[in-house]
Amino acid sequence: MELKFMDHVGTASPEEIARFTAMAEAWWDPQGKFKPLHRFNPVRLAFMRRHFAAHFGRDESLMRPFEGLTLLDVGSGGGLLSEPLARMGFAVTGIDAGDKNVAVARLHAEQTGVPVDYRVSTPEQLDPNEAFDVVLSMEVVEHVPDVSAFLGHATARLKPGGVFMGATLNRTAKAWALAVVGAEYVLGWLPKGTHDWNKFVRPSEFAAMLRDRGITVRQMAGMAFNPLSDTWRETDNLDVNYMLFGVKG
């Protein structure tokens, strides 16, 4: 759940902005309210690095394999993905509708010396001539009122031949049991009410909306939690958390 991007223009959800703004100070606390993000971030980043390297013909073993490429992190929150991706060489622009989230992200980037262009913005507010090699939307679509409109604005920022990377929760009974009941009410990983199961998006729905915007999904992968080791891993099972990689054109 990079749970944060809801704007005040066309893809608006003031309630969601308020919810995640209230937790903004906790973004970089690995034991705090965003602990799940810190836990599965390595899995997400490994998936991205592997597929970005293959698509752009870069050497994955290099420290900064993506020098010269631009990336837009839509709903960047406190910068938990923006910063490590910038360390990989991307010129990263992180946008979020919550000004407090952006303030936290900027401060942390200054403290760590990682160059990220953070903006209080939504995709439709960006310069229409501004385009990116990669557009990222991780754990965001389940928090917007109109997924189709949101994806339309986000993918419009993608260059031809560019990559869209997304992640969300599947609308299954298993996802309701684990991501809502388990994570919010039993384990207390997230504040109650963080997720609305009705807003979860099936992989087929996500892929179809992207296809309508000229993006072909090339790869999907799930993420599974092991309670014994307190770790996440990539899996072929898409029943709960899943990621997808698509190419425009």
Curated annotation (Swiss-Prot):
HAMAP family for this protein: UbiG
Parts of the chain that traverse the membrane: none
Pathway note: Cofactor biosynthesis; ubiquinone biosynthesis
Catalysed reaction, written as an equation: a 3-demethylubiquinol + S-adenosyl-L-methionine = a ubiquinol + S-adenosyl-L-homocysteine + H(+); a 3-(all-trans-polyprenyl)benzene-1,2-diol + S-adenosyl-L-methionine = a 2-methoxy-6-(all-trans-polyprenyl)phenol + S-adenosyl-L-homocysteine + H(+)
Amino-acid positions noted as binding S-adenosyl-L-methionine in the UniProt annotation, renumbered to this chain: 44, 75, 96, 138
Family affiliation: Belongs to the methyltransferase superfamily. UbiG/COQ3 family.
Protein name as it appears in the record: Ubiquinone biosynthesis O-methyltransferase
A GO biological process held by the record: methylation
E.C. no: 2.1.1.222, 2.1.1.64
Keywords for this protein: Methyltransferase, S-adenosyl-L-methionine, Transferase, Ubiquinone biosynthesis
Organism field: Paramagnetospirillum magneticum (strain ATCC 700264 / AMB-1) (Magnetospirillum magneticum)
NCBIfam families: UbiG (TIGR01983)
Its job: O-methyltransferase that catalyzes the 2 O-methylation steps in the ubiquinone biosynthetic pathway.
Top-level taxon in the UniProt lineage: Bacteria
Entry-linked Pfam families: Methyltransf_23
Gene Ontology molecular function terms on file: 2-polyprenyl-6-hydroxyphenol methylase activity; 3-demethylubiquinol 3-O-methyltransferase activity; polyprenyldihydroxybenzoate methyltransferase activity
